Swiss-Prot record:
<protein>
    <recommendedName>
        <fullName>T-complex protein 1 subunit eta</fullName>
    </recommendedName>
</protein>
<dbReference type="GO" id="GO:0140662">
    <property type="term" value="F:ATP-dependent protein folding chaperone"/>
</dbReference>
<keyword id="KW-0067">ATP-binding</keyword>
<comment type="function">
    <text>Molecular chaperone; assists the folding of proteins upon ATP hydrolysis.</text>
</comment>
<dbReference type="GO" id="GO:0005524">
    <property type="term" value="F:ATP binding"/>
</dbReference>
<comment type="subunit">
    <text>Component of the T-complex protein 1 (TCP1) complex.</text>
</comment>
<dbReference type="InterPro" id="IPR002423">
    <property type="entry name" value="Cpn60/GroEL/TCP-1"/>
</dbReference>
<comment type="similarity">
    <text>Belongs to the TCP-1 chaperonin family.</text>
</comment>
<dbReference type="InterPro" id="IPR027409">
    <property type="entry name" value="GroEL-like_apical_dom_sf"/>
</dbReference>
<keyword id="KW-0143">Chaperone</keyword>
<dbReference type="InterPro" id="IPR027413">
    <property type="entry name" value="GROEL-like_equatorial_sf"/>
</dbReference>
<dbReference type="Pfam" id="PF00118">
    <property type="entry name" value="Cpn60_TCP1"/>
</dbReference>
<dbReference type="InterPro" id="IPR027410">
    <property type="entry name" value="TCP-1-like_intermed_sf"/>
</dbReference>
<dbReference type="GO" id="GO:0016887">
    <property type="term" value="F:ATP hydrolysis activity"/>
</dbReference>
<dbReference type="InterPro" id="IPR017998">
    <property type="entry name" value="Chaperone_TCP-1"/>
</dbReference>
<dbReference type="InterPro" id="IPR002194">
    <property type="entry name" value="Chaperonin_TCP-1_CS"/>
</dbReference>
<dbReference type="GO" id="GO:0051082">
    <property type="term" value="F:unfolded protein binding"/>
</dbReference>
Length: 511
């Protein structure tokens, strides 16, 4: 398997200088070769078999599970993870482009080109590419936004439900706060088909552990008043080595009565507050559950802090550590309801002007669900990025081919060694459309020649589709401008950093 070559690469390399640089480029090339078949709508998946089964074509996830030990290889892993955290997409492209720049520069490095000159030229070309990318940017509207989400989904395992997921994701991001990552929650429920996935206008989470009396509690409440606590509403054992000395039965009874009085006081304070939905991150025991049921109150204990925080963020109120002062601490929404979802039960908090949204993903197996989750995460990040910057560019390798043309033209204006560096980088940018053509099953040589000719004639939106070179704007294939800018910046910076590494020193592990 290809990844084994990476894992068995020697970590301690005695070579220095140009030989070390060439060795590092070779390591990067081996890693990129493993990713190449995953690029684009017809990209293949990778299966990782270990303690858990992972099936994915997401670049960052693949690199994470490859267990790469080579230090330079780990730089590529960090590069992909950075792209994922910054803009959420382009994790495969950024590694492939970085590696191809290095591969095209490799003959120059072997011919003893000055590395400082190469680095300086890369910086100059990077700034030029960013400047031209800004000029390529197009204004975003709602129609383009849905198409942009569909473009991101096309290469994922939810592509057969592209229109449905595109609308669901765009509507969810529009409803939520763009800069609040927690305003969109994702829950994965095994069972059903991918098309059974839904977006909830509010918060939803799986029913927590319940005690006797839960069955008598209301499961649907209009305009609920929600109290969120970090309080334990049940008796608990004393701490280790705790001791209570009593002089008789009457004194022991007073201790028991005091315990009853404390928990009753807490429950009465909650009831007096007017709350009819009580959530706590700690347990709510039998007595409290039955007491609430008698007063028509729904309660749930051991709610995760993440879900409790999202309820507060969406419905208002605050998480309290005591029941003494509850006035003004209640949240509200339009509807609370507990519903059956497959073989699970879920608590829903909907409406009421909430800006939060929860996407409930369905799928036939855990591995499929995890990949759906990664696909939705990427699409959400892409839509968020586009809404934040309001600029998009065409996809399908059209941007890379146009930048390749611009860089090649720039190379003709140099009258020194920078001409060869620019030509090499221009060639490297053709790698993305070439791989798209290969993964589509097209004749790569004739397709790239055709695409190169179209761009030379001024058709800057021409990219690769299943039918060959086509106008990506007419096909509705878009990507956020920020994704391309981040990819270009990261690729140039990473390539410049790697070619300047002339030796590897293994530091001792810290004690």
């Amino acid at each position: 398997m290809n990844q084994l070559f990476v894992q068995t690469e020697k970590i301690v390399d005695p070579r220095e200088g140009k030989l070390q640089v060439v060795s590092n480029v070779d390591v990067c090339t081996k890693i990129a070769e493993f990713l190449e078949s995953t690029l684009g709508p017809y990209g293949m998946d990778k299966l990782f078999a270990g303690k858990e089964i992972v099936v994915t074509n997401d670049g960052a996830t693949i690199l994470k599970h490859m267990n790469i030990r080579h230090p330079v290889g780990r730089l590529l892993v960090a590069l992909s993870e950075s792209q994922d955290s910054e803009v959420g997409d382009g994790t495969t492209s950024v590694v492939i482009l970085t590696t191809e720049i290095l591969s095209c520069l490799k003959p120059l490095i072997k011919d003893n080109f000055d590395l400082g000159c190469i680095k300086g030229c890369l910086e100059e070309l990077r700034m030029m590419c960013i400047e031209h990318l800004e000029k390529m940017g197009m204004e975003l509207d709602d129609e383009v936004l849905y198409k942009l989400a569909g473009t991101c989904i096309t290469s994922k395992n939810i592509r057969h439900e592209k229109e449905y997921f595109s609308r669901m994701i765009v509507d969810a991001v529009k409803q939520a706060k763009i800069d609040d990552a927690e305003s969109i929650g994702v829950k994965k429920v095994q069972g059903g088909s991918i098309g059974d996935s839904v977006a909830v206008n509010g918060i939803a989470f799986e029913k927590c552990f319940t005690y006797a009396g839960y069955e008598q509690q209301p499961k649907r409440i209009l305009n609920p008043r929600i109290l969120c606590l970090n309080v334990e509403l049940e008796w608990k054992s004393e701490r280790d080595n705790a001791e209570i000395r009593v002089g008789g039965v009457e004194e022991y009874q007073r201790v028991v009565d005091a315990e009853w009085a404390i928990i009753r006081r807490k429950l009465d304070e909650i009831i007096s507050s007017g709350a009819n939905v009580v959530l706590s991150s700690l347990s709510i025991g039998d007595y409290a559950t039955q007491y609430f049921a008698k007063h028509g109150i729904f309660c749930a204990g051991r709610v995760s802090k993440e879900d409790l925080g999202r309820v507060v963020g969406s419905c208002g109120g605050s998480i309290l550590g005591a029941t003494d002062y509850l006035e003004g601490s209640l949240g509200a929404c339009a509807l609370f309801e507990e519903r059956q979802l497959g073989k699970f039960r879920y608590n829903y908090f909907e409406g009421g002007g909430t800006s939060a949204c929860t996407m409930i993903l369905r799928g036939p197996g855990q591995e499929v669900l995890e990949e759906i989750g990664r696909s939705v995460h990427d699409a959400v990040c892409v839509v968020r990025t586009a809404l934040r910057t309001r600029k998009v560019v065409t996809g399908g390798g059209s941007v890379e081919m146009e930048l390749s043309r611009i860089i090649r033209e720039k190379s003709m204006k140099y009258d020194d060694k920078r001409m060869f560096v620019a030509k090499a980088v221009g060639q490297a940018f053709e790698k993305i459309p070439l791989l798209l053509a290969r993964n589509f099953g097209l004749d790569t040589i004739s397709t790239i020649q055709d695409l190169r000719k179209r761009h030379a004639n001024g058709d800057s939106c021409e990219g690769i589709s299943i039918d060959g070179a086509r106008d990506m704007q007419k096909l509705g294939i878009y990507e956020p401008l920020e994704v391309k800018k981040n990819m270009v910046k990261a690729s140039f910076s990473a390539a410049a950093s790697i070619i300047m590494i002339d030796s590897t020193i293994m530091a001792e592990k810290s004690q």
